[in-house]
Curated annotation (Swiss-Prot):
This is Histone H2A-III. The modification N-acetylserine is found at residue 2. Monoubiquitination of Lys-120 (H2AK119Ub) gives a specific tag for epigenetic transcriptional repression. Following DNA double-strand breaks (DSBs), it is ubiquitinated through 'Lys-63' linkage of ubiquitin moieties, leading to the recruitment of repair proteins to sites of DNA damage. H2AK119Ub and ionizing radiation-induced 'Lys-63'-linked ubiquitination are distinct events. The modification Phosphoserine is found at residue 2. It comes from Gallus gallus. Belongs to the histone H2A family. Core component of nucleosome. Nucleosomes wrap and compact DNA into chromatin, limiting DNA accessibility to the cellular machineries which require DNA as a template. Histones thereby play a central role in transcription regulation, DNA repair, DNA replication and chromosomal stability. DNA accessibility is regulated via a complex set of post-translational modifications of histones, also called histone code, and nucleosome remodeling. The modification N6-succinyllysine is found at residues 10, 96. Keywords: Acetylation, Chromosome, DNA-binding, Hydroxylation, Isopeptide bond, Methylation, Nucleosome core, Nucleus, Phosphoprotein, Ubl conjugation. The lineage of its organism: Eukaryota, Metazoa, Chordata, Craniata, Vertebrata. The modification N6-lactoyllysine is found at residue 10.
Length: 129
């Protein structure tokens, strides 16, 4: 034979996404496309979308993990914007990162000024005597 054709050639390997290669859940291909279309730079390296997707995935996991605590405290199984607000505002670093962000339906942190709290008096002791 002259060696033409595909008689004994290897089968092509199954396609593997860049997200699965990097061990991520966030879409590396989509992040790469958005970086190219966003006119952030003339060229985008191969490692940049992987790194950015990993950072976004980490931040999302961190916020959702912290938001699960207020949800559990309120005996809820679904995280709502209020739980996200409480999680972010009670965490020092996340609050600094998202300080200027307004979360719709998030509400405010419960806070009562010390001046407005009722004063502790000795009336209890006077009544006991």
């Amino acid at each position: 034979m002259s060696g033409r054709g595909k008689q004994g050639g290897k089968a092509r390997a199954k396609a593997k996404s860049r997200s699965s290669r990097a061990g991520l859940q966030f879409p590396v291909g989509r992040v790469h496309r958005l970086l190219r279309k966003g006119n952030y730079a003339e060229r985008v390296g191969a490692g940049a979308p992987v790194y950015l997707a990993a950072v976004l995935e980490y931040l999302t996991a961190e916020i959702l993990e912290l938001a699960g605590n207020p949800a559990r405290d309120n005996k809820k199984t679904r995280i709502i914007p209020r739980h996200l607000q409480l999680a972010i505002r009670n965490d020092e670093e996340l609050n600094k990162l998202l300080g200027k962000v307004t979360i719709a339906q998030g509400g405010v942190l419960p806070n009562i000024q010390a001046v407005l709290l009722p004063k502790k008096t000795d009336s209890h002791k006077a009544k006991a005597k």
